[in-house]
Amino acid sequence: MSRTPHSVMIADIGYGNCKTILLTQAPEGIVERRWMIPSVVVQTRENLSSLGSSNIRKIQVGGTDIYFGPDILDELGGTQSGMRGAGSHYFESSTYRNLVIANLCESGLAVIDELVLTLPLDYYETAAKELKALRGQYEWQENGIFKTTTVVNVSVQPQALGALIHYRVLNANVGFEKSTRAVLDFGGGTLNFLVAQGYAGKKLRSGHVDYGVRSMWEDMAKEISRQIQASGRVAKFENVALIENAARSGRDYVSTAFGDFEMASLLKQTHSRLVEKVTEAARKMGDVSDILEIVLCGGGAAYIEPAVREVFPVQKIVCLPEPFFANANGFAMLSRKQMAGRELAHAE
């Protein structure tokens, strides 16, 4: 940054959810806001069940209606949309750009000095240049009122670097730069992993496995189907959104037309599958004997932790607090220092 920013937005837009932290300068100091919305935007009102939630916003971009917000999945009535069905180049999609606009709208600011976007390491190099071009002025209408936000600068960062910064700030251990650890980010669409010595990522030992929390919900739906059919009924359960909503709400059961199914039992059935996917990630890392710690983050961190402990019995397992926001938190910590005119130690 050429000057101290007065506003920084960190947007970690993943397959499943968009996690955003907004930092602004105020007379009393740096003020922080954070929010999380599903990575789903809807352009047709008919796709929504009622649009009765106050947690859904409607804006017009270029004459097209866009609906987004925390309750968008509930209003979709069990259907899925947006980035949850996108491929590896999701950052090139119109949904990604609309989610950027949705977050700018949510900020309520006329100017964002620095927009920090995060990407999985696999796509960071190819997409960084393209996403930096997202700076400029954005226009939309809401409730008939014309609004704009200008993004002065865009920086693109590897997601796992944020988790490493977060880890480093919370664990001021000696020898961080010389020790090797792996970050496992179990997100909505993929299990991303980064092997790094200090902050230096080892590209050939990093990557992803095509299995995320969404895949886990689908495996749980198959288990529900199996239990239904074992009871003598001919039916197939495919409403994955019911499972996701039960998990998001902290409910002990998934309530369906075929009865209630215990979440703990369903999760237990996914364990062998999670072990299989973590083992696949470990195999791609190569010789893991030099890895001192495994740092867990992402919305599915709690689900995958038992499998990680089984696959990595020797390494210390560190679960970052607020795993959904772990990547964004790291860059927010760094941005706070920059906004205050100070550098974060060892975070070059």
Region roles according to the model:
Residues 1-181, 200-213, 241-348:
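Nucleotide/phosphate-binding catalytic cleft detector across ATP-hydrolyzing
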Residues 180-248:
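Aromatic-anchored, glycine/proline-accented short structural segments
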